[in-house]
Amino acid sequence: MRVLLIEDDSAIAQSIELMLKSESFNVYTTDLGEEGIDLGKLYDYDIILLDLNLPDMSGYEVLRTLRLSKVKTPILILSGMAGIEDKVRGLGFGADDYMTKPFHKDELIARIHAIVRRSKGHAQSVITTGDLVVNLDAKTVEVSGQRVHLTGKEYQMLELLSLRKGTTLTKEMFLNHLYGGMDEPELKIIDVFICKLRKKLDAVSGSQSYIETVWGRGYVLREPDAEMRESA
């Protein structure tokens, strides 16, 4: 996969390059918006990763110029600005998605794949854990074919658990995912969200348990016990 990264912070750019190259992506990097526009026009990329705070011009201007130039390459904004108005503006200018820094490698890779699939008309991205199905594109959750209605925060937590299935996630990781370092509440709010999320899943799944507590560390999403699934 060919990726154009437009990012002026050399440390962040190097970190993202390492993330992508570990997945065998071909990454082309520039720290200037003007050069990013030229590269985006001249060459074919599967996706463009765009920072908003560039030294020569705004990332929004890069995005707007590319779209006015009929460049249809999918664009994922990677920004430290977590405000709703920033996200709405970016999507309004033609971005395909918006991720707030910092982010985890697994989520970045999953979102890139989902965006590229959509751009090529492929099927929606779905993560299945037992009878639990999380649709990353439609942002819906089902258990045994029955829709589970979650709040925005509950869905974000389940999405992160699904993306990192089998990996223990700390409460700090959840807080960062939910709030992006902005006005974060106390850690105990994560326990409250997990409790509500479990109740909603249990109401549909019955005896199946998906979210496991790892005492002193955090939470993990695991496949439900096979024997329990068969007896349910």
UniProtKB/Swiss-Prot annotation:
Keywords of this entry: Cytoplasm, DNA-binding, Phosphoprotein, Transcription, Transcription regulation, Two-component regulatory system
First-listed, main subcellular location of the protein, grouped into a coarse class: cytoplasm
GO cellular component: a single term: protein-DNA complex
SMART domains to which the protein is assigned, alphabetical: REC, Trans_reg_C
CDD domains documented for this protein: REC_OmpR_CtrA, trans_reg_C
Gene Ontology annotations of biological process type: regulation of DNA-templated transcription
Record Gene3D superfamilies: 3.40.50.2300, 6.10.250.690, Winged helix-like DNA-binding domain superfamily/Winged helix DNA-binding domain
Annotated DNA-binding residue span(s): 124-223
PROSITE patterns documented for this protein: OMPR_PHOB (PS51755), RESPONSE_REGULATORY (PS50110)
Role this protein plays: Essential protein that plays a role in the control of cell division, possibly through the transcriptional regulation of ccrM, rpoD, pleC, minC and ftsZ genes.
Protein known as: Cell cycle response regulator CtrA
Organism in which the protein naturally occurs: Brucella anthropi (strain ATCC 49188 / DSM 6882 / CCUG 24695 / JCM 21032 / LMG 3331 / NBRC 15819 / NCTC 12168 / Alc 37)
Source species taxonomy: Bacteria, Pseudomonadati, Pseudomonadota, Alphaproteobacteria, Hyphomicrobiales
